[in-house]
Amino acid sequence: MTFRKTSLVLLLLLSIDCIVKSEITSAQTPRCLAANNSFPRSVMVTLSIRNWNTSSKRASDYYNRSTSPWTLYRNEDQDRYPSVIWEAKCRYLGCVNADGNVDYHMNSVPIQQEILVVRKGHNPCPNSFRLEKMLVTVGCTCVTPIVHNVD
């Protein structure tokens, strides 16, 4: 799914959450909200993104060509949007040199990015959603190791 579609869905869900919290009375349990007859079935969200038509075409094999290659793993959770997030795991502790051999004089380290996801609620409020931060490993990079000299 594209960034644009993901952003639109996240904004839609956040808008619904705000409307629900501001216009709905409490249900049987104090933590859950119940819909009344004026509860909106849909919400229109206007999203303004700069450089809307900019397309970024990149090679899809960075994970193999990098001096710090990684493998992508599917992280799937049906109670989260997006339900599938691809995460990287560094293949080696060291880095690949020009000859294609692993050099342990350098370190392969993960690159992490914090993203926002929407999580579906469960008992006692199954029809609720909450926004959460998630730390995702998006790739790996090669760095010089930190060396501590013992005097």
Swiss-Prot record:
GO molecular function: cytokine activity
Keywords: Cytokine, Disulfide bond, Early protein, Glycoprotein, Secreted, Signal
UniProt source species: Saimiriine herpesvirus 2 (strain 488)
Localization in the cell: Secreted
Cysteine pairs bridged by disulfides in the record: 90-140, 95-142
Descriptive protein name: Viral interleukin-17
Signal peptide span: 1-22
Main localization, broad class: secreted
Organism lineage string: Viruses, Duplodnaviria, Heunggongvirae, Peploviricota, Herviviricetes
Keyword Secreted: yes
Cellular component GO terms, alphabetical: extracellular space
Record gene name: 13
One Pfam family named in its UniProt record: IL17
Carbohydrate attachment residues: 36, 53, 64
Entry keyword annotation includes Magnesium: no
